[in-house]
Amino acid sequence: MMDKRTLLKLVVLAFGASILLLVFGYTSGPKIVDEHTIRYVLEQEPSTLDPAKSSTSPEATVQLQLFDGLVRLDDKGEPEAALAKSWTVSDDGTRYTFHLRPNLKWSNGEPLTAHDFEYAWKRTLDPSTGADSAYMLYVLKNGEAFNNEKADRDDVGVEAIDDDTLVVTLEQPTAYFLKLLASHGYYPVNKKVVEANENWANDAETLVSNGPFKLLGWQHNGEMNFVKNEHYWDADEVVTKTMNWPISESQSTRLTLVEGGEADMMVEPPVADQQRLEEAGLLHIGPMLGNYYYLFNVKAEPFTNPDVRKAFSMVIDRKEIVKNIVKGGKEEAYAFVPY
């Protein structure tokens, strides 16, 4: 039998790099639920679960439970086979040929094929989609050109040769391409479902996915409920049967739910409580590759002047912010790429 603590650790791995600060709650008595149920307090209501249109960390966290791509990241952040059982790369590093696992299915039981990937990627790049994640597919041959209406859909470097084979051509060799494939912008979508209802990704009754879980219910701004997807290719390894995720943007409310035994974990506890929680062994600090930043409206005065923008950047005391405000092991950042 798997105890609650072990089960929680497995779920942390499933969430991947989106988790930075987690609070675990351990209670006894009638509030303990089945050990195969996970109760995670989501920090924001998703505006959509459409992989092409989502842009926030909470949306990505939910999608990680509902969708799966050609590859996924292991607990060390390295790509491993997922829907693709294998792949080959051309000598010049610009052409990838992916071979899908046999008998893949959507959560509604319909066959999932390489054509679903081709459709999804080209849909994301289609300017009429208005996809926030389109830029993530600019590594594809003519991906950026198509997104900017300078190339045709058929010019994009992704083609399903048959139901089980997907050929991808890149603009140039891209060492991190396999890691990109694990992100939501590269998830497949069901063409029939998408084209039947433009709001397909905003309701549990219409959302069709392919990941380890299915969306059973979605009470907007209230709670999301998940159930194990029996059609998932790796279903035998999914030990969690159900998940109940209350939604709250309030850090204090999320912490109250966890400490009161109404939830198992949350992300980003209030700064004032972090030391207490860490001393109690309830706070887990893990790595996250990401940035917090401010954006200037460069079309409005005075930020049309680059020197003004530089001046604002220079007077921001990043070390002070990290040490005394955000805390949690974060480091000051001076660029998007920290290495």
Predicted regions and their residues:
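Extracytoplasmic/periplasmic ligand-capture domains
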Residues: 3-28, 101-130, 207, 212-325
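Surface-exposed ligand-recognition segments of extracellular binding domains, strongest
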Residues: 22, 77-105, 118, 135-192
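Ser/Thr/Pro/Gly-rich low-complexity linker/stalk segments immediately outside membranes or between
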Residues: 28-40
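N-terminal lobe/hinge region of extracytoplasmic solute-binding protein
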Residues: 41-91, 122, 208-209
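A structural "hinge/loop" feature
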Residues: 44-61, 83-84, 110, 126, ...
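Gly/Pro-rich hinge or "lid" segments in bacterial periplasmic/extracellular proteins
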Residues: 149, 153-155, 159, 163-164, ...
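Structural transition elements
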Residues: 332-339
